[in-house]
Amino acid sequence: MSKRIIQLILLSAFARANYVEPFKSNPYIACSEASHCPKEWPCCSQYGQCGSGPLCISGCNPKFSHSPESCVPVPALLPQLEIVASDDKGVYLEMSGQPALVTKFQRKSSAQLLEVHHEEQQYGVSALEQDLNSRGLIHFPDYMITSKPKVAREMLEQYDFIHSGFISVDGKSESLILGMPKKTTGSLISSSKVFLYGRAAVTMKTSRGPGVITAIVFMSSTQDEIDYEFVGSELHTVQTNYYYQGELNHSRMRRHSLPSNSHEEYHIYEVDWDAERIHWMVDGEIVRTLYKRDTWDPVHKIYKYPQTPMMLQISLWPAGTPDAPQGTIEWAGGLIDWENAPDIKAHGQLAAQIQRVAITPYNNDFCPEIHESMGQWGAQNSEEEPFRVAYGYESNNGRFDPKKLKWYTDARLHLSSWHATGIKPTAAQRQQHHRRSLPHVEAPPITNTM
């Protein structure tokens, strides 16, 4: 179901008021294993549409793009290091085991608002977007779109999450609100960096009502996935699942009871993922474990185990809509009652509320080389040029697995316009489009929604 989450939300989340995003193929071009993107629109988005610019950055699928190089390498979130001294080893670096990202979405004291990132955003940003920027979130079409390396470095430093849909901040608690006003496609936030093994903890309240789905997902650009899904009519239950390289095997889903109502009470939902096993945890208690050894496919002679760099995504989306497949509607508990749902009547939208997110990256096979390169970098570069690592792929006979995963310290991670790509990072704007800024939809003002 999580693949459907992304398609439902993000194929249409920006296309409002008859606006067609100039970075998406027009007319629409779908990408799949059977049909890769054309040279003119080379990047296959996570949601199955060909395009350029933003679609080449976050979630760009190298499997179905024109070529793997069409996708920009993705910045990595690495394990935190600490300096250790001992009598036998001397002074050395060691992984601290501390989170590399912790946020309660409060304003950052060091925030530097960037009024304009690129040419298409010539009209600046809204007051809401400025507030979200100061809390470490940036609108999806604007992330890493700039012709200025200095601005790109500031974005990497400032922004923890990319957002789309109806995002706002609770005026009392300052928790982040994922909103879904009447007959819309909901909201999504995605971590701006990826990690290859790690632990993520999300403290949140889910939305409620038949047809309403809240989800916490680890998602890789090659479609490995680990998730939690919450059906809004089953507030004492959570579903867990995983997928390997986009293979839609729904037999792996499991249901688990929750200690209390997921809409009324905050719970901490965690995924603890390493090279050999996955733990799903609720409020510190393990509810499910998957071992890599149990995912062996004797036919293809591979482990069907998630093992590519993941971003963390948290979303709210409508499964119970008249145009959804009947099986999806039944799974979601029926159709959404857009007119009489209590939260629609009281607050103007359905909503999930996120209080805190923490991500702790783990060790992986690349870390020894990365740490060695880090030491060499520090000896040759100034503090103004921080050490950055990004992941990218080369094809392995159509399969994208750790054997073809590459890491870079010198990759260009930004594009100069909405029409640039990983192969042509400084491409100018297409002549058939006029410059304009993408409309940002303001969420209704919400205070103390839950």
UniProtKB/Swiss-Prot annotation:
Taxonomic path: Eukaryota, Fungi, Dikarya, Ascomycota, Saccharomycotina
Family in the record: Belongs to the glycosyl hydrolase 16 family. CRR1 subfamily.
GO biological process: ascospore wall assembly; carbohydrate metabolic process; chitin metabolic process; fungal-type cell wall organization
Residues at the catalytic site: 225, 229
Protein name: Probable glycosidase CRR1
A molecular function (GO) term: hydrolase activity, hydrolyzing O-glycosyl compounds
SUPFAM superfamilies reported for this sequence: Concanavalin A-like lectins/glucanases
Gene3D superfamilies the UniProt entry points to: 2.60.120.200
